[in-house]
Amino acid sequence: METKKNNSEYIPEFDKSFRHPRYWGAWLGVAAMAGIALTPPKFRDPILARLGRFAGRLGKSSRRRALINLSLCFPERSEAEREAIVDEMFATAPQAMAMMAELAIRGPEKIQPRVDWQGLEIIEEMRRNNEKVIFLVPHGWAVDIPAMLMASQGQKMAAMFHNQGNPVFDYVWNTVRRRFGGRLHARNDGIKPFIQSVRQGYWGYYLPDQDHGPEHSEFVDFFATYKATLPAIGRLMKVCRARVVPLFPIYDGKTHRLTIQVRPPMDDLLEADDHTIARRMNEEVEIFVGPRPEQYTWILKLLKTRKPGEIQPYKRKDLYPIK
């Protein structure tokens, strides 16, 4: 359950209904993840990788969406290569989640030695100059960790979120996100609360890759295909008077390290039109994700909206039919 605060911020709040037996399975899962998070990564990561790959074989619908996305985005890759990317994606997912849980339970001082920042000087300069910032963050599996780390260092952070289907998972997940402070804004409340936070000096966290439908989106290139991309970041940077900084986390299950890549601010968007803004957003996703595609959440319906006359790829029966 979520409780509204100050008409804009959402704070997860425990509800007595969470004690009901129907949620015991969820609590068992939470306890298991907490136990895993306290296990040294050199032991847990190989186990989580195997479990993730196994789960990826069972989750046929999620696997199908990922394969469809990859077939359209990387047609030059063989079927075996795309299958391998999906396997590694499912291996990476629980490893990144375990690191997030470890950060929440043990604190940043325990994981900082395993975190490498590339482009940290960009962030430090903006902090020195007291600039407003919106991070453009492709939807990777470790997406929440950089914001939590910055919050743990005293930087005020604000992000938008979708509620989880299970209320216990929703409560725990958002409690973890807020472990070191910051603000969460529900997407169904619109963009205004997020804008207000950025204007007040909170550094924003914006995920650019959700499909918002055709009405306000631009059809622009996305890897080897195209995508309906909402060019909202251009308006946000003007309304918030903020600089847009691309950022992407990469978790390596072999070295047990997290690399956070930070790229130069996208100041070129200030005078750009919507089509150019949308393409630049996708370009930043490509730069980050292209070399490490297993880090990206390919299970999302990224390519749902198509041009008139085209069938949504996830509804095409000829693409990876589930057997």
Curated annotation (Swiss-Prot):
Write down any Gene Ontology CC term. Answer: membrane
According to the UniProt entry, its GO molecular function terms are: acyltransferase activity; acyltransferase activity, transferring groups other than amino-acyl groups; myristoyltransferase activity
Observed phenotype of the null mutant: Makes pentaacylated lipid A rather than the usual hexaacylated lipid A.
What keywords sit in the KW lines? Acyltransferase, Cell inner membrane, Cell membrane, Lipopolysaccharide biosynthesis, Membrane, Transferase, Transmembrane, Transmembrane helix
Q: In which pathway does it act?
A: Glycolipid biosynthesis; KDO(2)-lipid A biosynthesis; KDO(2)-lipid A from CMP-3-deoxy-D-manno-octulosonate and lipid IV(A): step 4/4; Bacterial outer membrane biogenesis; lipopolysaccharide biosynthesis
The primary location reported for this protein is membrane
Instruction: Give the residue interval(s) assigned to the motif HXXXXD motif.
Output: 139-144
Membrane topology category:
Single-pass membrane protein
* InterPro entries on file: LipA_acyltrans, Lipid_A_MsbB
Q: Where in the cell is it found?
A: Cell inner membrane
Any one GO BP annotation for this protein: lipopolysaccharide biosynthetic process
Q: Where are the transmembrane segments?
A: 23-43
EC number, as in UniProt: 2.3.1.243
User: What family classification does the UniProt entry report for this protein?
Assistant: Belongs to the LpxL/LpxM/LpxP family. LpxM subfamily.
Q: How is this protein named in the record?
A: Lipid A biosynthesis myristoyltransferase
Organism (species): Escherichia coli (strain K12)
